[in-house]
Amino acid sequence: MASPTKPGTIEAPPAINSLSATQWTRPDYQLPVPSLQFLFHLECDMEDFHHIGQGPFGNRSTVIFKGGRFEGPRMRGTILPGGGDWEIVQDHDDIQTAHLNTRYNLQTHDGAIIYIQTTGTRTGKRSVLEKLGEDKSITPDQFRMRLNLTLESGDPRYSWVNDGVFIASSGRSGTQVIYDAYQVL
């Protein structure tokens, strides 16, 4: 198994030379390696945890967001109350994976509303993840939480978010979700 890429770096694809030229139509076609541009830092306050229980896809919970804040070079503002996370948790031996699915609204400092939806996973040792809501000493390097973000706005000042590709590195501390979002360029 290959070693993981060092955090903060992007691994370029290897040259295609393991197969004969007849198996590839364009082995010389060089695609650009994407880069990341910081979008914002976000801290979301959670409340009202509803444990629905074990269902056909895993252990489902709903978490309601009461608000929060975000700030970056191109936008800043607050998280409006009422959004939430509809997550499914699955246990595999001593590893736990939460499949995250959030929806909420951001309000920018200049009055625009941006709808945001995230999907992703939070995975790590079950003994660590089961303490996330209670133990603030757990650090982001003890588990992995990554998100894919979709942003939408009808405000012309933020129409650029409608066509963007966004990802985030995330974590949890007590009743907060914290993440740094990036635009993939």
Model regions: which residues?
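Beta-strand-enriched cores of mature, soluble protein domains
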Residues: 2-185
